[in-house]
């Protein structure tokens, strides 16, 4: 039970969503976060509000007033829900890159570079921005012999980790450059979201459904007349039916991004330790599927990705050996050719929201 000292407050949060579910027009909240927070259940940091949640799994709803919150958050309690005042006005940000050093001198690595890490089930967030503010363009502009230049530029904004399941994001913006969104856990649902980046900026082995979202490729000034990046890098296990599924969405670009400069995805086979050595996971037969999605002219199709074999040599993994498909793509970036395989109507019928999410129906939470 929640401590009776927690006041019940009610906010009217008008929400519009073009998904099979409608959100409640009002939601109770258990804590308020604001730079000017005063009084019971009001906090100046999101971390403090999360820490105030009781040690159970009851829904705990936190309302975030507009502002920029410079925090790195780890969610380990089930049923935490973050509701922002507005998507572009409520911003959670940090500036950690994989190649930066921890206090002990080791590197953060990709998994450690997150701004927000979800490692518990039944989390949701809506009407806010989660960003990794690592200045990728400024770093890339440095000379290669500059000792301050970071070599490992992966910078995750959101990590849905191993214990993350039934995770829902609505009207959320995820901003970064390389590796913006890492879906490592179970099932995630992104509705009416905006996700931006450059290289492999939606990646991982989890099941993630993107419904009516904007996938935004960013401009780069450090590369000319060559591939700028890739939207996805799935590492879905072959035994897992669904990976990264994008439906009824838009693949768009920032100003200055040239035609045919971005790939829809490439197959990531993570280097993994096995009984007979450490090498690229042969069972990571990644899946990315685009259905009923419009694509601007910067899209050229799929691309290959390298890994290490048992002897430590470079080996290449190709789109045709992965589960990469499209269905009814439209726009200047849409093409039908041997490299861009298409689903039949019958095959596309297997990619309903209910089937991809394995029966989980996202519902709006209420606090107590």
Regions found by a protein language model. Name each.
Residues 10-20:
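Bacterial N-terminal signal peptides
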Residues 27-368:
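Sequence-level preference for short, compositionally simple segments enriched
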């Amino acid at each position: 039970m929640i401590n009776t000292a927690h006041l019940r407050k009610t906010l009217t949060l008008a929400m519009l969503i073009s998904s099979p579910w409608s959100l409640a027009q009002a939601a109770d909240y258990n804590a308020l976060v604001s730079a000017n927070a005063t009084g019971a259940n009001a906090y100046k940091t999101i971390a403090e509000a999360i820490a105030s949640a009781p040690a159970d799994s009851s829904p705990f709803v936190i309302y975030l007033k507009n502002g920029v919150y410079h925090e790195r958050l780890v969610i380990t309690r089930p049923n935490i829900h973050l509701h922002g005042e507005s998507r572009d006005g409520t911003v959670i940000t940090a500036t950690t890159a994989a190649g930066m050093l921890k206090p002990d001198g080791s590197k953060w690595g990709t998994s450690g570079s997150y701004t927000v890490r979800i490692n518990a089930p039944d989390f949701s967030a809506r009407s806010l921005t989660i960003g990794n503010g690592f200045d990728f363009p400024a770093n890339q502009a440095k000379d290669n012999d500059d000792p301050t230049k970071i070599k490992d530029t992966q910078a995750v904004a959101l990590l849905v980790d191993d214990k993350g399941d039934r995770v829902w994001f609505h009207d959320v913006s995820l901003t970064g450059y390389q590796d913006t969104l890492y879906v490592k856990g179970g099932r995630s649902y992104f509705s009416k979201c905006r996700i931006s980046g450059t290289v492999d900026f939606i990646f991982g082995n989890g099941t993630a459904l993107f419904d009516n979202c904007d996938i935004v490729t960013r401009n780069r000034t450090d590369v000319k007349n060559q591939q700028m990046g890739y939207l996805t890098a799935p590492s879905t296990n072959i035994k897992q039916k669904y990976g990264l599924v994008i439906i009824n969405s838009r693949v768009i670009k920032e100003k200055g991004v040239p035609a045919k400069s971005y790939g829809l995805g490439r197959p990531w086979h993570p280097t993994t330790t096995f009984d007979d050595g450490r090498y690229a996971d042969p069972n990571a037969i990644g899946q990315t599927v685009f259905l009923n999605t419009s694509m601007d002219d910067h899209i050229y199709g799929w691309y290959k990705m390298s890994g290490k074999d048992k002897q430590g040599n470079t080996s290449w993994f190709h789109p045709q050996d992965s589960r990469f498909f499209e269905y009814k793509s439209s726009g200047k970036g849409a093409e039908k050719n041997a490299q861009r395989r298409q689903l039949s109507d019958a095959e596309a019928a297997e990619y309903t929201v209910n089937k991809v999410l394995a029966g989980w129906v996202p519902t709006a939470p209420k606090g107590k």
